Amino acid sequence: MVLLRSFARHPVLPTFRERFGLRAAAIAAYPMYRGLARLAGMEILPTGTTIAEQLATLKERWADFDFFYVHVKRTDTAGEDGDFAAKVKAIEEVDRALPALVSLRPDVLAVTGDHSTPATLRAHSWHPVPVLLWAKTCRPDTVTTFGERACAAGGLGHLAGRELLTVMLAHAGRLTKFGA
């Protein structure tokens, strides 16, 4: 028996570079996310499955691209397994990697999720995901913790996922000025 999930025809989409003018790369261990990145016209960089290996890949290829999409699967897997402690541990591992990311001096750094996976539900859910946006041009807010409730009260408020890249491009000075 063969079970095909989300099987469809290959859509014709503009590449990431055509749409946003950026050379984009994806660092992802999980095949579905590599496939989505390829569909978006990103170069898929070979990497390992740990955050340390993904960070090493990022550092090694830092000068070659304008945009990096780094996918960490462990937080999602822990949520699907209903393992709250493992989810906390995975998130803390991402937290520990942030100083190394900031040391690369990105124009913009965004940390978020593609969906919420609460350990209590053991499944993807409708809940909003927190978003951390760091750039020299960001206005500081009063948020000191990273979580759904805290981030919703921050400077970005409730942001639709389709708006995130535009906000990132604005903070990177990559949008065409409009108005006076």
Task: For each feature predicted by the language model, list its residue ranges.
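Feature captures the catalytic ectodomains and active-site-proximal regions of enzymes
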Residues: M1-A180
